Amino acid sequence: MPSPGVLTRAAVLSVAALAATITHATEKGMPTTAAGVQDFGAGFMPPTTPFGTVGMRISDYQARVIKDSHGKDNGNDFNINVLAIGLAYLRMTDQQLLGARYGFGAVSVFFRMDADLGIDAGGQRVFSDSAELFRPADVQLIPLILDWRPAPGVGINTQLSIQAPTGDYDKDRLVSPGTNHWTVSPILNASYISPSGLELSSSFQLDINARNAATDYRSGVEYRHEFAVGQHVGDWTLGLGGYYYRQLGDDDAPGLTRGNRARVLALGPAVSFFQPTSGLPAIWLHAYKEFEARNRAEGYTVALRIGASF
């Protein structure tokens, strides 16, 4: 059976992972909610504590190419950099619902965004735009978390996340931290840690989007599978993580003749460090490269997370 320290490390991750939120709406070629949030310990929630658990996530995403529906560079002069700083609060209780512990949480994020786009036709620049800003993104409310521990080394939880259109938004700006629409996301997370310390973790999420009233654009339903495989070695967990993102439904907007369905795969190294008796927060770090993008940007992301229960 995994040691209590291993399970505690996995549990604290869950709130650190919450400290992330949206990038752009799919109408701008990016997913509605953040990708690459979960890796090790996705299925474990923190213990019940007097004051709850807090987490922080800092991520940097960079892309210099937009892929078309065939996976080819669309030829535009494009560059985007998004630095996200997210704070999360999670409170698990001893109340039981459907045989699980009940909990709730919330996430608030700020984005520093720097984007440039140039379009050439006939050897001449016909369009150019840029934006640089540091503004709040949409708030995520998590009114329902259910946490099960069905067997030693096994953690399963389900969550309902509601993303409210509270972030800064301007339909005439190249990029915006906010999406200007509501999103409801059912989530299922699971982890298994073997007696030898081998970990398998997965997170499955659907994003169901409302219509953007400013543009009359409704993004299709989005699916995300985030995963990690790693080995626990003392205070470290070393392995591989990533995510698979795919838009399941067509976008809907006036004059839109194609569904604009996006997809992408990301892979890269992931590592975590935690000493249960040290009093230090748990730390997770991963670096992912995106592949096989369709109808969206393709780039790189690095994310650092910390979490602690009080």
Q: Which residues does each predicted region cover?
A:
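Cleavable N-terminal export/targeting peptides
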Residues: M1-T32
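Surface-exposed strand-loop-strand hairpins of Gram-negative outer-membrane beta-barrel proteins
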Residues: E27-T33, D60-A84, I119-A131, L174
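Transmembrane beta-barrel strands of outer-membrane/channel proteins
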Residues: P31-A34, V54-Q62, F104-F110, T158-A164, ...
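Residues on the lipid-exposed face of transmembrane beta-strands in outer-membrane beta-barrel proteins
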Residues: A42, M56, L87-R91, L141-D147, ...
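Residues that define the transmembrane beta-barrel architecture of outer-membrane proteins
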Residues: P50, N79-L87, L133-Q140, G178-V184, ...
